[in-house]
Swiss-Prot record:
InterPro entries on file: Nucleotide-bd_a/b_plait_sf (IPR012677), RBD_domain_sf (IPR035979), RRM_dom (IPR000504), U1_U11-U12_snRNP_70-35kDa (IPR051183), U1snRNP70_N (IPR022023)
Disulfide topology: none
Pfam families, A to Z: RRM_1, U1snRNP70_N
Function comment: Involved in nuclear mRNA splicing.
Protein name: U1 small nuclear ribonucleoprotein 70 kDa homolog
Organism for this UniProt entry: Saccharomyces cerevisiae (strain ATCC 204508 / S288c)
Listed GO CC annotations: commitment complex; nucleus; spliceosomal complex; U1 snRNP; U2-type prespliceosome
Compartments, record wording: Nucleus
Low complexity biased stretches: 265-279
Resulting phenotype, Y150T: No splicing defects. Associates with U1 snRNP
Length: 300
């Protein structure tokens, strides 16, 4: 577009003058027609032939990949562990276990996360309140005869086992000495396809794991893992506006009267109200209305 610069002053027309052309610079690359590979370039086979020959004679099988051996060991250990669990699972049958033979699974409860120094007599004191107990068995190691931290209790009445499970349960727990123990039903003979934790199953984590470990440090320290020690006190009653905590300057009656109880006349039934009509507008029409009108170029 050509502009008539004669109508502008000299200081303004000087701003619209074209710039000088770019200076010529010699290209750094060769032209496309003259490009070619250096004919003096040769391979490295002659240089490495002697070195490679000595290396292959010294290491005929190559050096071991030690950084990959660790991954292979972990992979093999997982495969062996899975095969071992499969063999143990095939031999596991709770219905033929001599320790629980001739017992009703619906009258039996499972107690986990027990203290390791707890015996049957002390355990009976915590569950005798639910009903008469027929049998208590704390599972122990066959070699060391030490407790494994869980036990089974058989009641004489199935209602007693249901009451113990509903009152204590898995989430609430019961405190025995310095540990929070859980109570569950016997799932080995009542739940199909159930596997114990030692065979790759189970329903939860360890007792020493923190329940609030996913929280940040300052929140996890304030919370407690014992549900019985948590504070479930009701909230304080809502304060009235007349209390000393609320100043009269902010929530006083004068502000409310001036804002919500002014001297505006109330609408009565006889007062005519304007009819509200809604006109539909498409999206394109609303866009055109919101856009400003184009400015016309001045004609000097």
């Amino acid at each position: 577009m050509n502009y008539n610069l004669s109508k502008y002053p000299d200081d303004v027309s000087r701003l619209f003058k074209p710039r000088p052309p770019l200076s010529y610079k010699r290209p750094t690359d060769y032209p496309y027609a003259k490009r070619q590979t250096n004919p003096n370039i040769t391979g490295v086979a002659n240089l490495l032939s002697t070195s490679l020959k000595h290396y292959m004679e010294e290491f005929p099988e190559g050096s071991p990949n030690n950084h990959l051996q660790r991954y292979e060991d972990i992979k093999l250990s997982k495969i062996k562990n899975a095969q071992l669990l499969d063999r143990r699972l095939q031999n596991w049958n709770p219905n033929v276990d001599p320790h629980i033979k001739d017992t009703d699974p619906y009258r039996t409860i499972f107690i986990g996360r027990l203290p390791y120094d707890l015996d049957e007599i002390e355990l009976q004191k915590y569950f005798v309140k639910f009903g008469e107990i027929e049998k208590i068995r704390i599972v122990k190691d066959k070699i060391t005869q030490k407790s494994k931290g869980y036990a089974f209790i058989v009641f004489k009445d199935p209602i007693s086992s249901k009451m113990a499970f509903k009152e204590i349960g898995v989430h609430r727990g019961i405190q025995i000495k310095d540990r929070i123990c859980i109570v569950d039903i016997e799932r080995g003979r009542t739940v199909k396809y159930f596997k114990p934790r030692r065979l790759g199953g189970g329903l939860g984590g360890r007792g020493y794991s923190n329940r609030d470990s996913r929280l940040p440090g300052r929140f996890a320290s304030a919370s407690t893992s014992n549900p019985a020690e948590r504070n479930y006190a009701p909230r304080l009653p809502r304060r009235e506006t007349s209390s000393s905590a609320y100043s009269a300057d902010r929530y006083g009656s004068s502000t409310l009267d001036a804002r919500y109880r002014g001297n505006r006349p109330l609408l009565s039934a006889a007062t005519p109200t304007a009819a509200v009509t809604s006109v539909y507008k498409s999206r394109n029409s609303r866009t055109r209305e919101s856009q400003p009108a184009p400015k016309e170029a001045p004609d000097y």
